[in-house]
A protein has these predicted regions:
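Viral virion structural and adsorption modules
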Residues: 1-3, 149-158
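Solvent-exposed edge beta-strands and adjacent loop segments
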Residues: 1-77, 121-138
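Polar, enzyme-active/binding microenvironments
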Residues: 17-26, 30, 106-116, 156
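Structured, beta-strand-rich domain cores
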Residues: 60-108
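Short intrinsically disordered coil segments
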Residues: 90-95, 139-141, 156-158
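Short beta-strand and beta-hairpin "edge-sheet" elements
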Residues: 103-154
Length: 158
């Protein structure tokens, strides 16, 4: 697959049970809740904290560093809905779920074996309504701290 836009090519699923985060099964993923349609276009941020460790010495003029810790939270911007409000009602304080992100295939494409996905073990904060503004839809912010190392190169199993 060549280069592709994000629009219409990301799928976000909240999954209750994943036995192996390196190889979530099609059945596990399909048992989850597909939330992509409840997120704003800019509404998904995956953990990007990358810390470095200084290893330079006083004898050197170069500030040497090596990789250190990494992590963070999955941050999402949800869209309020005056009918079902599915995502708002789903997210509760301390809810544990796997946030599964698939990039590339069209959003509506069913999960299939051999697809690459990212799997983030997360616990959610209470969703918080965003500040109001004119000519905007009603939004809310979701923070889901990732509590153990995610698998960014998982492959869907049959």
């Amino acid at each position: 697959m060549g280069k592709y836009p994000n629009d219409g090519r990301i799928r976000v699923q909240l999954v209750a049970v994943v036995a192996n985060i390196a190889a979530p099964t099609v059945a596990e993923l399909n048992a989850g809740t597909h939330i992509t349609g409840f997120l704003s276009k800019d509404g998904l941020t995956t953990p990007a904290d990358q810390n470095n460790v200084d290893v330079g010495t006083l004898a050197e003029t170069f500030n040497a560093q090596v990789p250190g810790t990494f992590g963070g939270a999955v941050e999402m911007t949800g869209l309020k809905d005056d009918v079902a409000d599915t995502l708002w009602n789903l997210i509760t304080y301390d809810l544990g779920r796997y946030v599964v992100v698939r990039r590339g295939p069209p959003t509506a494409t069913a999960y299939a074996a051999a697809q690459p996905v990212e799997v983030y073990p997360a616990r959610f904060h209470e969703p918080v309504p965003d500040q109001t503004g004119g000519d905007e839809v009603s939004r809310f912010t979701i923070s889901a701290p990732v509590y153990s190392q995610p698998n960014l190169k998982a492959i869907v199993a049959a």
